[in-house]
Amino acid sequence: MQTNLYFVRHAHSTYTPDELGRPLSECGFTDANTVTDLLKREAIDYVYSSPYRRAVQTVEGVAKYIDKEIELVEGFKERILAEKPVEDFSVAITKVWKDYDFSWKGGESNRVAQKRGIHATLQVLESNIGRNVVIGTHGNIMVLIMNYFDNQYGFDFWKKLEIPDIYKLSFNGKKMKDVQRIWNKS
């Protein structure tokens, strides 16, 4: 029986140092409406999300449409790059992708973040066999999850993601069978 997980990278957010509470921008809310419109066509059964506000706000229209509460899952929160803002994000993110076991002080290595994301993903798969499930999340953790099932999804793929973006991962049991990009702004 096929299970479909729709991973939704959050829409554009207004920068604040508060990672958990950072809201969507005006443009982000517009794109979140497009996310809802696209996913209305997919017969969604449940909606899960990272607890970060921007991820929740991106998928809350889908939850309202299907009249279900969003279930918050810590495992889908963004990977922690470092305990403090890094001087050069590009250098910092490149290093963790080149060495899966490297982590900056107070941050998560790719391997640790991936393990967290996969644990959450497998729990969702096990409790939603044969269903269509939306997961509001973040770019880095989303690609780490995809990479676990197919290593073609790596750093270069992450760099090409849009904000927001939607990927439908189809599973038979715990085996990923297909990946389709759903996001289309037009």
Labelled PLM ranges:
Residues 23, 64-118, 159:
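Phosphate-handling substructures
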Residues 13, 141-142:
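Short active-site segment of divalent metal-dependent hydrolases/proteases
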Residues 61, 144-148:
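Active-site signature of alpha/beta-hydrolase-fold catalytic machinery across serine-
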Residues 5, 131-140:
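Generic beta-sheet signal
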Residues 33-40, 118-126:
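Generic structural signal for well-ordered alpha-helical scaffold segments
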